[in-house]
Structures are given as structure tokens and as C-alpha cells.
């Protein structure tokens, strides 16, 4: 979680470091195509998408330090994008939440390359730290931190 162990490998990079003794992340790796573009995220609480945030970082991608170190990233909320793109990201976040059977709160991450929207992942245990995106989006739609936590506790279920 939190992008620990994520590496971006570009053409010409020395990939031998990923198979050297001392590589701390095990024998197997998952490889995905890197998608250039702007990064967005949208939170869902229950059956409602909250907002779209653009995540801006000079670190290359939204890695651990960009997420948890103060000043590691800038969150623009609401994202400064056209309404059609904004609405589509909100729709896709809610659709992903529902399609995966998520309950409570989730957050979907997206990349936009100027033409296509790509869903990167759905976070089913999103952070609640002072730099986390869920509390920011909740505040943006006038849900206080206390109200958010109360809603999460009231709607928690221990069934399968």
C-alpha cells in the first residue's frame, strides 16, 4: 500500500537492480504500462461520489513521500477541468465502488492523458491523516471530519 515498492522504469533504465540480491520486495513483480498525464482522485461515501481532486507532485508520481510528507503534493479541489470530464470521473468512481461491492468509503484514482480516462485503482481503506484526500473531499462538500468518522462508524458492518 501507499505506493511502497512502486518503481517507474523507463526505456533504457538499468533493470538489473530489480533482480539483485537484497531487492526487498520478493521474487515476483507486477508490470503495468505507465500512463502519462494528469492524476485525479474521487471519493465515494455510501452511494455518493464527493468530488474530484487533481493531485500535483514534482516527484514523478504520487509516491509515499508525496502522500505523507507535508508539501509533497498539492491537491486541487475541485479539479480545474471541464465539467464533462469532472462528471465522468465522478460517475466512474461511483460505478467502480458499486461494481466491486465496496461498502462505506472508497477512493478511486485516475490518470487522464488528454484523451482517455484510465482508472488506476480503487482504495478500499483510504487514509484519514491530515494530508489525506478523503477528509479534504468531505470538507469540500461540507462534511466535517467528525461527521465523516461518525458516518463511517454508524455504517460499519461485520457481515460478509
Question: Where in the sequence are the language-model features?
Answer:
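Phosphate-binding site of ATP-dependent enzymes
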Residues: 11-88, 117-118
Amino acid at each position: 500500500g501507499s505506493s511502497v515498492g512502486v518503481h517507474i522504469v523507463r526505456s533504457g533504465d538499468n533493470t538489473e537492480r530489480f533482480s539483485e540480491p537484497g531487492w526487498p520486495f520478493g521474487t515476483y513483480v507486477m508490470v503495468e504500462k505507465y500512463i502519462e498525464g494528469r492524476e485525479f482522485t474521487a471519493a465515494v461515501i455510501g452511494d455518493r461520489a464527493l468530488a474530484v481532486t487533481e493531485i500535483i507532485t514534482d516527484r514523478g508520481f504520487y509516491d509515499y513521500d508525496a502522500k505523507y510528507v507535508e508539501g509533497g503534493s498539492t491537491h486541487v479541489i475541485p479539479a480545474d477541468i471541464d465539467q464533462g470530464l469532472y462528471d465522468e470521473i465522478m460517475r466512474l468512481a461511483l460505478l467502480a465502488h458499486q461494481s466491486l461491492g465496496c461498502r462505506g468509503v472508497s477512493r478511486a484514482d485516475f490518470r487522464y492523458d488528454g484523451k482517455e480516462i484510465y482508472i488506476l485503482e480503487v482504495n478500499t481503506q483510504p487514509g484519514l491523516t491530515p494530508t489525506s484526500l478523503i477528509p479534504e473531499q468531505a470538507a469540500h462538500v461540507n462534511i466535517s471530519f467528525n461527521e465523516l468518522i461518525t458516518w463511517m462508524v454508524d455504517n460499519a458492518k461485520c457481515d460478509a
